[in-house]
């Protein structure tokens, strides 16, 4: 950035601050609630692997977030997970500027605008364990900037697009790049039907990875059904294309008991082919290494019931059974085998 540009930015900043000061002097102070809001999610569960006869208790999520408004147009959010599979992770850290109701600009770390299921927070999930799309194939948080715009053409159309480092929050100190990752998402919110299309480009190594996702959600009364498909392509044929699918249905049944407010039976089918995270492994002085299979091809059928002790997604007990089907030669990770899951989720 040259001196002329820097000087212009400083002058614009001074003018903005002067205008704001004059506004307050004229008695036009904004009626803004600046009290920070503290929210959190705790997910604790017991899992029993039916084939191995082994079980475990786990605190899967212990998230705490602080969000609020600085002015009518400026807001912020910071969220941390104190126990993401035993690790402390910074999740969100961003400032959002919304000059009017249809336009917003966000800068910082956030979940990039891509897919349906990966964008659900833990308290908004329908099942105890996420789909393959949300967990392995399309799950990305990164540092960058994003623009969102909403149209109303008889129904809302929401478009979000952004550019991102590719470094994540923890690796950004000495991270410099000549290129950027990008992600874009369009939501068509028809009555009772949501159509979502999204695309993303990442570059974990010298191999660029392009992803394309499409999904439809149907909701009517207490019934919801959703299907989502993701296609992943690696440049230079570094790895074969990846396909992933997720489909589920859920029906809410209100009940009148002192403890349980709603019972929701649900079923899911998801699938993914052999998958690489895009990073090279087994590098030597003479070889860059190669992309490997990080997740083997598998199908999964999940069935269960959710007991809501309050409003939906506030205090839920999720009881699931997961049945896995691996391809011949596929290696199952320790936590991805046939199992019964009982999870308690609390949102505050």
PLM feature spans:
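Generic N-terminal leader/processing signal
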Residues: 1-2, 21, 107, 266, ...
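Active-site cleft segment of glycoside hydrolase catalytic domains centered on the general acid/base Glu
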Residues: 172-176
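Outer-membrane beta-barrel pore domains
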Residues: 50-52, 71, 96-98, 118-120, ...
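Outer membrane beta-barrel
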Residues: 26-168, 178-180, 186-194, 248-250, ...
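N-terminal periplasmic/intermembrane-space "pro-region" immediately following the signal or transit peptide
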Residues: 1-9, 18-43, 348
């Amino acid at each position: 950035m040259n001196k002329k540009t820097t000087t212009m930015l400083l002058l614009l900043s001074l003018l903005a601050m002067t205008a704001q000061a004059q506004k307050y002097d004229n008695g036009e102070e904004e009626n803004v609630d600046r009290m920070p809001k503290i929210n959190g999610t705790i997910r604790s569960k017991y899992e029993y692997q039916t084939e191995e006869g082994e079980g475990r208790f786990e605190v899967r999520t212990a998230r705490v977030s602080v969000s609020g408004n600085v002015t009518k147009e400026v807001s912020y959010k910071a969220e941390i997970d104190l126990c993401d599979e035993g690790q402390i992770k910074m999740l969100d850290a961003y400032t959002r500027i919304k000059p009017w109701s249809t336009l917003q600009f966000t800068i910082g770390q956030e979940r990039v605008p891509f897919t349906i299921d990966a964008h659900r927070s833990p308290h908004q999930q329908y099942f105890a364990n996420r789909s393959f799309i949300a967990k392995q194939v399309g799950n990305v948080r990164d540092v960058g900037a994003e623009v969102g715009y909403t149209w109303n053409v008889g129904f809302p159309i929401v478009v979000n697009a952004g550019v991102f480092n590719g470094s994540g929050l923890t690796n950004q100190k000495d991270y410099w790049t000549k290129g950027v990752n990008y992600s874009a998402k369009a939501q068509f919110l028809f009555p009772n039907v949501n159509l979502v299309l999204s695309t993303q480009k990442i570059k974990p190594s010298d191999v660029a990875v392009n992803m394309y996702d499409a999904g439809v959600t149907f909701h009517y009364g207490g019934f919801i059904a959703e299907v989502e498909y993701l296609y992943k392509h690696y440049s230079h044929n570094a790895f074969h294309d990846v396909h992933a699918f997720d489909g589920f249905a859920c029906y809410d049944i209100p009940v009148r008991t002192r403890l349980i407010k709603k019972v929701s039976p649900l079923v899911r089918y998801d699938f993914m082919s052999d998958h690489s995270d895009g990073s090279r492994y087994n590098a030597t002085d003479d070889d860059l290494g190669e992309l490997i299979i990080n997740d083997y091809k598998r199908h999964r059928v999940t069935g269960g019931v959710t007991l809501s002790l309050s409003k939906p997604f506030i205090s839920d007990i999720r009881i699931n059974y997961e049945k896995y089907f691996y391809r011949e030669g596929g290696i199952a990770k320790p936590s991805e085998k046939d199992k019964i899951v009982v999870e308690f989720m609390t949102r505050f």
